[in-house]
């Protein structure tokens, strides 16, 4: 780059130093010389011979021009609104095609990074919505008759944990009951019902 600027600097001529004074000077442009009568006559004859007189006649009573202008402005607004709806991908592809990969090697990386960012933002948006639905239960809250499911408890006391243990060395907590649904003896977490169901078998 330094070579480039040095090369241009040699071609550019240095500016002359200008001294400013407090005196105000009025610069008058040279006026055109006044035409003689013969020259004026020649100009008038030339204007009459030429087809174009230098003036346009516009009929102000006709309102078709105004209607056409309004229609054109509406079409332009439609085009603008349609262009605003175009996705970031199409905007970036247009940018890439306009500037070209060979001319600007960074354009490809700009396109890819922006596309990555767009995908990431879309994924996070979907994930946030899913999390909101899970924790707030927006779908269930919309219908008033539906019953909200009880979330599993994880704050069990040691005595409760012992009561949930069976003789086989594994635990049925409320979450597993909700998932599996049917256990032998219609288990509700009590060891007695589990033992009864197993003894029947």
Swiss-Prot record:
Comp. bias intervals (Acidic residues): 64-78
Composition bias type Polar residues, residue spans: 189-201
Superkingdom of the organism of origin: Viruses
Biased composition (Basic residues): 96-106
Region (Disordered): 64-114, 182-201
Protein name, UniProt field: Uncharacterized protein ORF29
């Amino acid at each position: 780059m330094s070579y480039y600027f040095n090369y241009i600097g040699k071609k550019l001529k240095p500016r002359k130093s200008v001294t400013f004074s407090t005196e105000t000077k009025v610069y008058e442009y040279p006026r055109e010389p006044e035409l003689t009568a013969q020259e004026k006559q020649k100009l008038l004859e030339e204007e009459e011979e030429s087809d174009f007189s230098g003036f346009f006649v516009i009929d102000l009573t006709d309102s078709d021009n105004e209607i056409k202008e309004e229609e054109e402005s509406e079409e332009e607004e439609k085009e603008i609104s349609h262009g605003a709806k175009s996705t970031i991908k199409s905007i970036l592809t247009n940018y890439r095609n306009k500037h070209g990969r060979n001319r600007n090697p960074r354009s490809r990386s700009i396109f890819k990074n922006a596309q990555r960012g767009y995908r990431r933002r879309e994924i996070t948006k979907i994930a946030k919505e899913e999390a909101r639905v899970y924790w707030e239960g927006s779908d269930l809250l919309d219908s008033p008759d539906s019953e909200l499911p009880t979330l599993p408890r994880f704050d069990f006391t040691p005595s409760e944990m012992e009561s949930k243990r069976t003789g086989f060395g594994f635990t049925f907590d409320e979450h597993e009951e909700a998932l599996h649904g049917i256990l032998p003896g219609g288990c509700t977490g009590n060891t007695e019902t589990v033992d009864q169901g197993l003894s029947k078998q």
